[in-house]
Amino acid sequence: MSMQDPIADMLTRIRNGQAANHVSVKMPSAKLKVAIAKLLKDEGYIADYAVADEAKPELEVTLKYFQGQPVVETIQRVSRPGLRIYKGKNELPKVMGGLGVAIVSTSKGLMTDRAARLAGMGGEVICYVA
């Protein structure tokens, strides 16, 4: 069976891995998944990520914990294949009053909601992380 929404699968694997206190989670790799993992690392939500170049590339995300609790409290898919959500530069959401981040796909690539606001760009809201 084919996977309908690989980004939602990635977010679910991270959510489930942290709920089960796993050190890392593995998933099939894709450029968009690697870009999301890079943003999550830059924002401090995951410890690290690595791409294993084999016959089938695999992305391994090393999860991050603080005092035994997962750093990621919520990770939620917003725009999905059946219902795309686009926001203009003035409509970009603030997650948890600015404590979390929204990952936005813009014409300049993936960036956080803060970076998109500074660049004066809107785009497709991929997910919320807090």
From Swiss-Prot:
Signal peptide: none annotated. It comes from the Bacteria. One of its GO terms (molecular function) is structural constituent of ribosome. GO terms for cellular component: ribonucleoprotein complex; ribosome. Disulfide bonds: none annotated. Gene3D superfamilies: 3.30.1370.30, 3.30.1490.10. It holds the Pfam family Ribosomal_S8. One of its GO terms (biological process) is translation. PROSITE patterns: RIBOSOMAL_S8 (PS00053). Keywords: Ribonucleoprotein, Ribosomal protein, RNA-binding, rRNA-binding. One of the primary rRNA binding proteins, it binds directly to 16S rRNA central domain where it helps coordinate assembly of the platform of the 30S subunit. Belongs to the universal ribosomal protein uS8 family. PANTHER family: 40S RIBOSOMAL PROTEIN S15A (PTHR11758). Part of the 30S ribosomal subunit. Contacts proteins S5 and S12. This is Small ribosomal subunit protein uS8. It comes from Shewanella baltica (strain OS155 / ATCC BAA-1091). The lineage of its organism: Bacteria, Pseudomonadati, Pseudomonadota, Gammaproteobacteria, Alteromonadales.
